[in-house]
Amino acid sequence: MNIKSILTNLVLILCISIASSAQELLPTSTTGQIVKHTYYTLSYCEKDEQSEWVYYELTSEMVKGRQPRTDDYRPDEKVSNVSEQLEDYRHSGYDRGHLCPAGDMKLNLTSMSESFYLSNMSPQVKEFNDGIWNTLEERVRRWALTCGRIYVVTGGVLTSNKGKIGPDRVSIPKYFYKVIYDPRGKGKMIAFLIPNEKSEKPLQDYVVTVDSLESLTGIDFFPELPDSIENHLESSKDVSSWSFHK
């Protein structure tokens, strides 16, 4: 076997190892319908016609990617009994808000295109989507650049909604959340819970404990972490180890 073949095999083994590690950190599903795409995994809630969570690994390489937006919004054929359609958002007054943002999926054409499945969308107030939610997305990308690799879980809180839109009755969450885990060293975790409305407040005002978010959603976000690590990280809302200013 030549050196090129050996290096190729080593890279393949490393990629498989990373993918396996990411899958091991999946949140629990309250719906039983877990859908795996190449660069993210989701748990779909049929009664709300959207995902209760989207989970993915975000690396500095992904953030540095140059793939342009594809804007190819479409139903996710991997979802059983899928009925959510573009028509549901038309003239609704709500944005098709990304859960896993397109800005995180610039690695290649596949990652970018997959981010436009409607299963990765949720109805968001425009000022929220363009405002504080976008600010949080940009901040998460900065953390990925600093940390090299982080894990993100995000979604709307489906236990509380503002009504429905469209013929398929897509729920409008009152709140959206993100949980970010940095596995380096002893690990650190931070969680946000933000109302689906315009806000001028700083992101720090919306930091909550992961424990409180789990109680609200019924989801265990990182069940495969050792209990000693999980219990310590999920009970804290200390922001001192997370940069908000650069």
Predicted features and spans:
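Domain-level detector for secreted/extracellular nuclease and nuclease-toxin modules, and
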Residues: 14-246
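Bacterial N-terminal signal peptides that target proteins for export
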Residues: 1-10
